[in-house]
Amino acid sequence: MTEMDHLAGERVELLAAAREAAAHAWTPYSHFRVGAAVAVDTAEGRRIVSGANVENASYGLTLCAERAALAAACQLGVAGEPPRVTAVAVVGLDAQPGECMPCGACRQWLAELAPDAAYYVEGVEETLHLDDLLPRRFTLNR
């Protein structure tokens, strides 16, 4: 299997997992269902975790699908270290193809927890990376 075959397979697998997660979104206000899937390298091997957006009447408390999935990924890592996220996929069931790009808060979460990950969006053919999503991003020098 070539690297291109591997990436194509990963993309299909993660987008399918994100689509399944989106079906479980709680969106009584916007009716805009989003799912995300994250590939994580763990000591036991590669795992896929997912999350869906969960809305709240106080909109600022709404949890995006990307952040839900990244929070789940943190549970798979070593305590005190970020998870080893290799790829993230996002699907919006009620979105036009390519419309479901991450919000600013999710982009910052990606910068913190998945800086080297490939980013797949349903309807966008190219594989995106953090520099595409958040150029000149804020970081703290540690």
Language-model region placement:
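Glycine/charged-rich beta-loop-alpha catalytic/anionic-binding loops adjacent to active sites
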Residues: 42-56, 87-88
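Charged, well-structured alpha/beta interaction segments
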Residues: 27-31, 46-47
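Short HxH-centered metal-ligating active-site micro-motif
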Residues: 63, 67-95
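C-terminal binding/interaction regions
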Residues: 2-27, 82-142
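Compact, glycine-rich, soluble single-domain proteins
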Residues: 52-67
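Short beta-strand scaffold segments in enzyme catalytic cores
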Residues: 31-42
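A generic structural signal for short beta-strands and their flanking turns/coil linkers
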Residues: 32-34, 50, 84-86
